[in-house]
């Protein structure tokens, strides 16, 4: 199974732990191509230096030290490639293939940093199907049979809105994680999926920590236990066994 993910900065800020787990997978049946657009690195740099984000700093350090594993392949977008992709051509193609057209005002108010991301995503998701990469792609990616079916992984609502307008498929980190676990048939995922959904359903409060992780809070009277395997002996302390 081949999974092609375009990962933006918000995914690293809110799902760094998940991505770290993906990078350590060594399942020969699974290949995760992780494409980091120029936008991702620049946005993490901004969060680190301008807003003193500890999570962004950790994310950049993680990317610097990241090495390919059996299942995880990292692909970085270079500035030259992003500059070579025409924004006007991207908008033109989007207008041609969309049932709803964007107004000139809607296009003009898009911040430059998001234009960079949209160019990267549209290039990976749509350009190649239109054979427009011949003058753009100098990395010979066109010959790669795995280079198709790209999906944007994002936690940013603004990015999701723009992705919808530009016909760029997107999913959340949690959804990407579920897809990966389903591909490798992780037993812990299968066993705990129903329990996790029940926790989220019964939670009356959600707290988000600095590292992006979410804590679901439930009432004491509604507390319940995780499912235990039907077979097996219940563990008891050694001291209790000796007394009996």
UniProtKB/Swiss-Prot annotation:
It is found in: Cytoplasm. Its main location: cytoplasm. One of its GO terms (biological process) is nuclear-transcribed mRNA catabolic process, nonsense-mediated decay. Signal peptide: none annotated. The keyword RNA-binding does not apply. GO terms for cellular component: cytoplasm. The keyword Flavoprotein does not apply. Keywords: Cytoplasm, Nonsense-mediated mRNA decay. It comes from the Eukaryota. Involved in nonsense-mediated decay of mRNAs containing premature stop codons. This is Nonsense-mediated decay protein 4. It comes from Kluyveromyces lactis (strain ATCC 8585 / CBS 2359 / DSM 70799 / NBRC 1267 / NRRL Y-1140 / WM37). The gene is NMD4.
